[in-house]
């Protein structure tokens, strides 16, 4: 009978524990969506400002 409370406590603890091992994020863990969004905003800025071909001739897109 002494084992029953211990067994119940262990069952409650294992049920509330996360099923996946959670690792802390490092600086190398960059989500792909932010990389894609940064590239998109850079391209949008280039296209909005116009493209210069190296000479004095610049044309907007």
Swiss-Prot record:
One of its GO terms (cellular component) is extracellular region. The keyword Transmembrane does not apply. The modification 4-hydroxyproline is found at residue 60. InterPro entries: T-conotoxin. Expressed by the venom duct. Its main location: secreted. It is found in: Secreted. Exists in two forms, due to cis-trans isomerization at 59-His-Hyp-60. Failed in phase II clinical trial by Xenome under the name Xen2174. This structural analog of MrIA was developed to overcome the relatively poor chemical stability of Mr1A in solution. Initially intended for treating neuropathic pain, the promising results observed on rat transporters did not translate when tested on human transporters. Chi-conotoxins inhibit the neuronal noradrenaline transporter (NET/SLC6A2). Activity has been described on both human (inhibition of norepinephrine uptake is IC(50)=1.26 uM) and rat (pIC(50)=6.21 corresponding IC(50)=0.16 uM) transporters. Acts as a reversible non-competitive inhibitor. Belongs to the conotoxin T superfamily. This is Chi-conotoxin MrIA. It comes from Conus marmoreus (Marble cone).
